[in-house]
């Protein structure tokens, strides 16, 4: 450790080891080194009275050095020496013992009076709070010259005459040279105050030297942490930080250290001129900014520039760089800028305004004078009505100065406005023993550093609760320890933990105590251990020192001379904005940064653009982060427009440029000062219910009341000097862009001088804490706010480390989260949505996806609200995005089947179109995806479980169990179903009435609905539920529970009935067209006459029975011959009710062929497999039958059966895993009796028993094989099987027709599943009984 001891301008560096030495020992070492520095022998007499710290405070002789000073600190010695050297080079031995020819005694010999005043034993300087508050640092004279010791001490005070200090008359008593002395009061009999301040005290008697500095009751060191010196030390530190000290010695090096003869001794009276301005209500045309000294003190308002053609320029009232120090009765010095502006506005109400101005030529001297005088300028000296003496003193016996008044010749008045106490009663008539000088401007080792331990700050007691994320801050120490220890500082605040949640601890705070344990002498490791010893959920108490920095106002252009009309003045008193239109107010906030340095201002900003020309409209506050500095300040609001930040204007800049300016200014200037200055424009509330929290109420605001220190309301004209608001062509151009008529941010068209864009016309009713959040400070994203507001996504308020997300209260006022370009930084990083699937844009993407269930929003809502709804997924929700192979489908179905029962009730989904489809196929069915399908329980809409045929047929003619059954509509026509028919008729009648009623109401909706029905007609066949009325009513109750309002329920019900009525018409017509097309295709493929020869009579009978076209005479003859052979009467031809023009047949066939092209990747052997449909021939067959049926044929049939079993194992596993329907109805009984009377041949029976077709047995009765099986899975399977069937049919068509009668077994024509299906589905009028299958 080492310190620097300053003996005047001579500095001595003294090594101190570990700092465990006393101050007394330090003085001894410093004196020894000083003697060597000035080349004096060891007998040279030097007495050090005390040591003062460079930052203030007196060091006690018994203090341990490391306790009162830090490493490399600078100490000032107050000392006396035997022979002041007057020109000798202190570093050269050749000047040893030499003196300047102008000896000190010669001055005394030529003058009858001395330049020093006698020293009195009772004139010890007394340190009092008044002296300290008066910014009067203490200094002690050096009167140890031996040539003066013989002077008499009885010299009368009246005989004193002072002389100006000069090189001929050096004044070595000063601790630091080269600074002007304080203008203090002198003797009452002295008329010239310039001479009063030059009194010096005579040296004391050598016999009293030992008694000069003693510790007694009247003497005590003043601790640096004493509250009385807080204010004085802060001001002193500001001066020290702004003062540059010349460390080089004047030439010659050993010359006397005073140069006051080069500096004129002037006062503020000589510099100030009085300007009288009559108040005619017009603007002065000046732009003013705060004028601050280097130490941070505000010295007034500086005239930055004059408006061309303005009043100030025309009447020559002001000039550029003039400094206004006083307006009327208000002193503008040492005032914050907002306070000065408030005083300015108050002065505008007077008829005549008196400006006290320091001209630009004297500005430099005025700034230097301000270093010596804190407030010596009399407040009422140039007041127009100051015609009386205003004696200001705190003691009756305090001497009064009689200054001159050169301007208006007012009576003299006391100059020193600071209080001063007399030293004693009997010495009150004498001049002060030591005139006060300027504070010693000794630079500290860390000038401007907030971490200087000697700078007294604020004591804070902070309690932190340790959570799972720890205390949340890190500590550091100095590199060079002092006495084995070093002060502990908070290094930074972590983004998570107790510190940032509490918000009070700040980076740079010095830790004094932890849980009552003093950290003095503790190392950093010990402090860390002490902090870590805190238990989880425990509380740690921290005592910290924080250095308070004075706010340095940035230079801002303003026009405070803008005159207000009486109406506007009244409006200001009533807390209304100052702009003439009365729609907006300009607020300036001094927002202290959050105690955690990383939190920043804590706002999210947005850049708005014009909807018409896309011009940038400015930067606005989008949201205020809960827990940030702006949120704690509580005055900034959402939709406030940022005009300037830390004096940097954001107007007239592009949004991106303004964002960069904002980010740069807040990250550098805000962190440096610990405070961010914001100028915002806010639309005024109509009812004043949203008054700024920091603004005082209107009735309680007197004229003299100053606004809050952190808030000021300023007219727009005050900030017209800011870029974009300047009264210039450039400014008008910028405002013309801002004031463009924009629907986003409508404003009233007003003069450009008083207009600033406000973002929204709606009232900002949300408090600052109800806002969006983010985990970064002052983050921004240039979003574009939509005109239609949408509700925010609901989010849970989080108590995490950063902050919480709160939804907007009013959805009308909330901006649209799905707006173009809208995503905050917090959403990009943390995705803090409560449920992303509930967001509108997510739903939109889902509903438009080719691979997702139709209309997720509707289905999810109904499923979630349906009581007892099963949660197991079936079908496409199994995870099959694209079920292009039977293997993936079979595996998924098998897994679900093994896991448990499949739910019975499911909403009818749309088909997944994940397989490869060309555009024509997609165009045919894509309209079915416009709206969600009606739920299976709604109004008796048919489900796959209850009517396999009706719901499973698609435009591509699926090969499924439904192919084995006759259509339900045909069965209903042949069978007759009065109950179902009556219900259908009632539905149709009701739907007809509803159509007339709702035709105009649902005109727009019908467009989408018609498209849906058209597409569904090609894909599905619809029918009526076979459920009873009870199940139908239960379905209605369930769907009603899923809607919240009666209106929605009625609308949905009417819509469903209308859709059902239309879909029934489509179903009946399409069923007829489909059956006709299928029969025609079968007839063209095989031919009834060919099948008669080898396929069995029942097959041919079925072919004729289902044929819907007129028969030729040849066909009729063959039919009669066939019936004659089997000895069965032939029934009449079936009715023509099923006849229909095959209008859609060609289109359906074309779509099938196109779809099959994408799936022709099966094994070649599968395509060549053949099937045996051989039957046992009855004995009544003609003798011409060929004898090709032999043993070899039997062997070949068995081989084919084995191949079929192996090739269709996948289909077997799939269908075998499905539950089978065990019950039978009338149709199954009739089918059994038919099979008993007419048993098929061996080949046909083997084909039916083939594992490939074994699944057909379980669904022959009109019911799906497994109850509750999902329709989508069945349709997927049907499509895959149907593709294979169609490929084989096409291959069969390509075979050349063979002439003649073929045998029962054919190798060249592979049978297809449709043959078995048609054989099994054929009906006959035998015995007058209808055929059921």
From Swiss-Prot:
Phosphoserine: modified positions: 25, 156, 174, 383, 692, 695, 715, 728, 806, 824, 834, 849, 869, 958, 967, 969, 1042
Biased composition (Low complexity): 1176-1199
GO MF annotation: an example: phosphatidylinositol-3,4,5-trisphosphate binding
SUPFAM superfamilies documented for this protein: PDZ domain-like
Free-text tissue specificity from the UniProt record: All isoforms are expressed in heart, while expression in brain is mainly limited to isoform 1, and to isoform 3 to a weaker level.
Chain intervals with Basic and acidic residues compositional bias: 190-203, 977-1005, 1026-1039, 1046-1071, 1144-1171, 1283-1292, 1324-1333
Ranges where the PDZ domain occurs: 271-359, 461-546, 590-677
Known role: Adapter protein involved in asymmetrical cell division and cell polarization processes. Seems to play a central role in the formation of epithelial tight junctions. Targets the phosphatase PTEN to cell junctions. Association with PARD6B may prevent the interaction of PARD3 with F11R/JAM1, thereby preventing tight junction assembly. The PARD6-PARD3 complex links GTP-bound Rho small GTPases to atypical protein kinase C proteins. Required for establishment of neuronal polarity and normal axon formation in cultured hippocampal neurons. Involved in Schwann cell peripheral myelination.
Family stated for the protein in its record: Belongs to the PAR3 family.
Domain notes: Contains a conserved N-terminal oligomerization domain (NTD) that is involved in oligomerization and is essential for proper subapical membrane localization.
Official protein name in the record: Partitioning defective 3 homolog
Species in which this protein is naturally found: Mus musculus
């Amino acid at each position: 450790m080492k310190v620097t001891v300053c003996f005047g301008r001579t500095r001595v560096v003294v090594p101190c080891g570990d700092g465990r030495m006393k101050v007394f020992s330090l003085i001894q070492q410093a004196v020894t080194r000083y003697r060597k520095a000035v080349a004096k022998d060891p007998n040279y007499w030097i007495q050090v009275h005390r040591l003062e710290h460079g930052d203030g405070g007196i060091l006690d002789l018994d203090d341990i050095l490391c306790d009162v000073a830090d490493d490399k600190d600078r100490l000032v010695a107050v000392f006396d020496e035997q022979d002041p050297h007057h020109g000798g080079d202190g570093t050269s031995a050749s000047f040893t013992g030499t003196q300047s020819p102008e000896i000190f005694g010669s001055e005394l010999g030529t003058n009858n009076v001395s330049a020093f005043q006698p020293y009195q034993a009772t004139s010890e300087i007394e340190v009092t709070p008044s002296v300290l508050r008066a910014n009067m640092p203490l200094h002690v004279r050096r009167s140890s010259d031996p040539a003066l010791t013989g002077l008499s001490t009885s010299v009368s005070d009246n005989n004193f005459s002072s002389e100006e200090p000069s090189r001929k008359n050096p004044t070595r008593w000063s601790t630091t040279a080269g600074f002007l002395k304080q203008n203090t009061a002198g003797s009452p009999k002295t008329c010239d105050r310039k001479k009063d301040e030059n009194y010096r005290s005579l040296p004391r008697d050598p016999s009293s030297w030992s008694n000069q500095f003693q510790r007694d009751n009247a003497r005590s060191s003043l601790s640096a942490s004493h509250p009385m010196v807080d204010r004085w030390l802060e001001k002193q530190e500001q001066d020290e930080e702004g003062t540059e000290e010349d460390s080089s010695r004047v030439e010659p090096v050993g010359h006397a250290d005073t140069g006051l003869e080069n500096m004129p001794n002037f006062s503020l009276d000589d510099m100030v001129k009085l300007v009288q301005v009559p108040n005619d209500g017009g603007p002065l045309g000046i732009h003013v900014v705060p004028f601050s000294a280097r130490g941070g003190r505000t010295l007034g308002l500086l005239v930055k520039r004059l408006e061309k053609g303005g009043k100030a320029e025309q009447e020559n009232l002001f000039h550029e760089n003039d400094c206004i120090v006083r307006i009327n009765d208000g002193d503008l010095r040492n005032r914050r800028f907002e306070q000065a502006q408030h005083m300015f506005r108050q002065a505008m109400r007077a008829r005549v305004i008196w400006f006290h101005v320091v001209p630009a030529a004297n500005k430099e001297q005025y700034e230097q004078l301000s270093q010596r005088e804190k407030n010596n300028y009399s407040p009422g000296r140039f007041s127009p009505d100051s015609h009386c003496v205003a004696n200001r003193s705190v003691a009756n016996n305090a001497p009064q100065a009689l200054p001159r008044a050169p301007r208006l010749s007012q009576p003299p008045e006391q100059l020193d406005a600071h209080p001063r106490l007399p030293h004693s009663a009997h010495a009150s008539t004498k001049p002060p023993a030591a005139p006060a000088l300027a504070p010693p401007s000794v630079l500290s080792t860390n000038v401007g550093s907030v971490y200087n331990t000697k700078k007294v700050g604020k004591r804070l007691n902070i309690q932190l609760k340790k959570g799972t994320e720890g205390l949340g801050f890190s500590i550091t120490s100095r590199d060079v320890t002092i006495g084995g220890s070093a002060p502990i500082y908070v290094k930074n605040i972590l983004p998570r933990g107790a510190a940032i949640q509490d918000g009070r601890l700040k980076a740079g705070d010095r830790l004094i105590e932890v849980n009552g344990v003093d950290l003095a002498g503790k190392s950093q490791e010990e402090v860390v251990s002490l902090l870590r010893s805190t238990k989880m959920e425990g509380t740690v108490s921290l005592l910290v020192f924080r250095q308070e920095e004075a706010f340095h106002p940035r230079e801002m252009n303003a026009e405070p001379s803008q005159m207000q009309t009486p109406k506007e003045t009244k409006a200001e008193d009533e807390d209304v904005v100052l702009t003439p239109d009365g729609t907006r107010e300009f607020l300036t906030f001094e927002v202290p940064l959050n105690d955690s340095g990383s939190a920043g201002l804590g706002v999210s900003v947005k850049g708005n653009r014009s909807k018409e020309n896309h011009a940038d409209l400015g930067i606005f506050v989008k949201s205020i982060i809960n827990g940030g500095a702006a949120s704690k300040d509580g005055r900034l609001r959402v939709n406030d427009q940022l005009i300037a930040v830390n004096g940097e204007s954001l107007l007239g800049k592009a949004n991106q440029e303004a964002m960069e300016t904002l980010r740069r200014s807040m990250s550098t200037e805000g962190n440096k000062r610990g405070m961010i200055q914001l100028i915002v424009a806010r639309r005024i509330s109509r009812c004043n219910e949203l008054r700024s929290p920091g603004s005082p109420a209107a009735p309680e605001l007197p004229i003299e009341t100053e606004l809050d220190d952190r808030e000021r309301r300023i007219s727009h004209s005050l900030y017209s000097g800011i870029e974009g608001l300047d009264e210039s062509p450039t400014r008008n151009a910028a405002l013309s862009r801002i004031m463009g008529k924009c629907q986003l941010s409508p404003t009233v068209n007003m003069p450009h001088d008083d207009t600033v864009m406000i973002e929204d016309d709606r009232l900002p009713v949300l408090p600052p804490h109800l806002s969006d959040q983010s985990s970064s400070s002052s983050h921004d994203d240039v979003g574009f706010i939509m005109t239609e507001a949408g509700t925010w996504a609901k989010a849970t308020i989080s108590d995490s480390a950063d902050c919480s997300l709160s939804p907007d209260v009013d959805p009308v006022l909330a901006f649209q989260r799905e707006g173009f370009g809208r995503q905050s930084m917090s959403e990009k990083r943390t995705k803090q949505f409560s449920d992303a699937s509930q967001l509108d844009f997510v739903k939109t993407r889902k509903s438009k996806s080719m691979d997702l269930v139709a209309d997720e929003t509707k289905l999810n809502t109904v499923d979630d609200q349906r009581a007892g709804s099963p949660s197991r997924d079936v079908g496409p929700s199994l995870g099959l995005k694209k079920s292009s192979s039977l293997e993936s489908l079979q595996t998924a179905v098998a897994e679900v089947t093994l896991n448990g029962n499949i739910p019975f009730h499911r909403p009818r989904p749309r088909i997944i179109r994940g397989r490869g489809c060309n555009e024509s196929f997609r165009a045919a069915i894509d309209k079915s995806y416009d709206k969600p399908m009606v739920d299976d329980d709604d109004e008796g809409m048919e489900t796959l479980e209850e009517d396999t045929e009706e719901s499973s047929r698609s435009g591509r003619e699926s090969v499924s169990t439904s192919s084995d059954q006759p259509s339900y509509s045909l069965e209903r026509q042949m069978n007759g179903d009065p109950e179902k028919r009556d219900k259908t008729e009632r539905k149709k009648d009701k739907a007809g009435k509803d159509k007339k009623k709702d035709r105009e109401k649902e005109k727009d909706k019908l467009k989408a609905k018609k498209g849906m029905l058209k597409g569904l007609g090609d894909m599905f066949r619809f029918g009526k539920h076979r459920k009873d009325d009870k199940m139908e009513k239960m379905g209605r109750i369930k769907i009603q529970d899923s809607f919240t309002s009666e209106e929605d329920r009625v609308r949905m019900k009417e819509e469903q009935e209308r859709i059902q009525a239309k879909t029934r018409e489509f179903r009946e017509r399409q069923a007829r067209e489909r059956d006709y097309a299928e029969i025609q295709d079968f007839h063209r493929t095989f031919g009834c006459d060919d099948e008669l020869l080898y396929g069995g009579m029942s097959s041919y009978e079925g072919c004729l029975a289902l044929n819907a076209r007129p028969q030729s005479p040849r066909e009729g003859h063959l039919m009669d011959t066939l019936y004659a052979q089997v000895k069965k009467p032939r029934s009449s031809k079936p009715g023509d009710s099923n006849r229909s023009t095959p209008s859609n047949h060609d289109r359906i066939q074309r779509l099938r062929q196109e779809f099959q092209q994408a799936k022709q990747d099966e094994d070649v052997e599968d395509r060549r497999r053949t099937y045996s449909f051989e039957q046992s021939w009855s004995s009544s067959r003609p003798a011409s039958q060929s004898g090709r049926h032999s043993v070899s044929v039997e062997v070949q049939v068995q081989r084919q059966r084995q191949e079929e079993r192996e090739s269709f194992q996948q289909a077997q596993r799939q269908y075998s895993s499905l539950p089978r329907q065990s019950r039978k109805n009338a149709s199954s009984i009739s089918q059994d009796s038919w099979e008993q009377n007419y048993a098929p041949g061996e080949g046909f029976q083997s084909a039916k028993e083939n594992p490939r077709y074994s699944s057909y047995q379980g669904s022959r009765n009109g019911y799906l094989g497994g109850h509750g099986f999902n329709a989508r899975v069945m349709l997927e399977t049907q499509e895959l099987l149907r593709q294979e069937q169609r490929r084989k049919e096409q291959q069969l068509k390509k075979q050349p027709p063979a002439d003649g009668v073929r045998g029962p077994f054919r190798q060249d024509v592979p049978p297809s599943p449709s043959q078995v299906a048609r054989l099994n589905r054929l009906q006959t009028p035998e015995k007058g009984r209808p055929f059921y299958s």
